[in-house]
């Protein structure tokens, strides 16, 4: 059951000034939220990543390659995706540039 909402954030590199960040666009998607598993956490730590949460989207087509998302007022970097049938899991870590 999809019981939560995240906002996938995409960048538009064509819309910016010379010294400005690219403009961003947010898209709302429904998901299920679960914690990152211990094995996943330990494997990621070996690569200097700190997975915190896994968002499961019921339809993999809803994910369009975004690198960041917003949930609960915080920005997260998407560090891993895993397709499982029609679903896709997005493993994320908290962004340091909030």
Label each PLM-derived region with a short phrase.
Residues 1-20:
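Active-site-proximal polar cores
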Residues 21-98:
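Short, conserved turn/kink motifs that form compact alpha/beta structural patches or helix kinks used as
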């Amino acid at each position: 059951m999809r019981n939560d909402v995240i906002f996938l954030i995409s960048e538009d590199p064509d819309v910016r000034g010379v010294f400005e960040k690219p403009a961003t666009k947010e898209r709302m998607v429904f998901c299920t939220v679960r914690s990152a598993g211990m094995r996943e956490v330990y494997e990621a730590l070996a690569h200097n990543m700190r997975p915190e949460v896994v968002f499961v989207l019921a339809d993999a087509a809803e994910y369009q390659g975004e690198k960041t998302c917003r949930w609960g007022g915080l920005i997260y970097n998407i560090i891993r995706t895993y397709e499982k049938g029609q679903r896709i899991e997005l493993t994320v870590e908290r962004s340091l540039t909030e």
